[in-house]
C-alpha cells in the first residue's frame, strides 16, 4: 500500500510541472519538438530535430553522412 502512495505522489509531482517543457521532458509530446523549435530547414522527428539533408523515416532521423 505504501508503494501505491509513493507512486501516486511521484505521478502527482510530475504532472504538477506544467507547460510544453514538462511534456517534452517526460517524452509525452509527439516528436518531442514542435516545428518552431527546429528551425526552417528542420522538422521534428522522433524526439529530435531532423535537418536537411537527413531524412525522417518511421520516427527516426536517418543521418546522411559519408559512406561507411
Swiss-Prot record:
Main location: secreted
Subcellular location(s) of the protein: Secreted
Location of 4-hydroxyproline modifications: 44
Function: This peptide promotes cell proliferation (EC(50)=17.85 uM) and inhibits apoptosis (EC(50)=2.2 uM).
Note, other: Negative results: this peptide does not show activities on voltage-gated sodium (Nav) and calcium (Cav) channels as well as on nicotinic acetylcholine receptors (nAChRs) (at concentrations up to 100 uM).
Sequence similarity: Belongs to the conotoxin G2 superfamily. 1 family.
Protein name: Conotoxin phi-MiXXVIIB
Amino acid at each position: 500500500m505504501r508503494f501505491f502512495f509513493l507512486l501516486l505522489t511521484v505521478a502527482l509531482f510530475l504532472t504538477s510541472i506544467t507547460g510544453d517543457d514538462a511534456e517534452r521532458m517526460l517524452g509525452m509530446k509527439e516528436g518531442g519538438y514542435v516545428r518552431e523549435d527546429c528551425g526552417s530547414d528542420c522538422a521534428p522527428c522522433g524526439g529530435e530535430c531532423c535537418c536537411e539533408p537527413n531524412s525522417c523515416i518511421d520516427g527516426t532521423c536517418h543521418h546522411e553522412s559519408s559512406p561507411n
